Amino acid sequence: LYLLGEQHRIVGITRYTVRPKEAKENHPIVSAFVDGSVKKISALNPDLIIGFSDIQADLAAKLIRANQQVLIFNQRSVAEILEVIMTIGRIVSAEERAQKLVDQYQQSIESSIQRVSLLKDKPKVYFEEWDKPTFSAIRWVSELIEIAGGEDVFSHKSHGKLAKEREIQWDDVIDMNPDIILASWCGKPVDIESIKNRPGWSEINAVKNDRIHEIDPSIILQPGPASLTDGLEVLTSLICSD
């Protein structure tokens, strides 16, 4: 909504809203991600409540029972992220501005694809979304890794809609032997030393060559504009650094 110039429509946000920085100064925080006060949210008298993912299903149900209008997105791919931008643009009568944004992102993605097409070899990349249990191959990240010039070693799992479908074992990573390990643990810092010290991981190329990197969750784990801009830029710099 900020990118569309429609931020004046926002009456409340979650405490996990981090972009843009001024959002927390401009709008009241009325919920967490999973939990929220139906009373506080309803008191804002919103015309529409927008949420993301099946994880918010219980909160959405409570709000619906309180006679609120609720729209939950569950975008998982780059194409779906772009469609969400268009949908929100239509809702707030800013479709033209939304289309311009989408066009910019698509042009940037296409430029990246053309640039990396010149690479002779694509490094094998392992992305870790969470450590215990270990999850990988969240779809939009898997796609962005490919766009940035890498080869996601678990891309075959990326179409799994549920986290349990993307769970992996540490031995699987050893077998894949990635050249680069990227990690972004939502809600806590990545412990790179613990990754290095996992049984058998000392033989992985990424560990031997010290190519383990943490990525800020706010630019990679949120399937929105940030992942298509800052997230893609960071991925490209880390994957193509050599």
Segments from the language model and where they lie:
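N-terminal ligand-binding lobe of clamshell/alpha-beta domains
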Residues: L1-D242
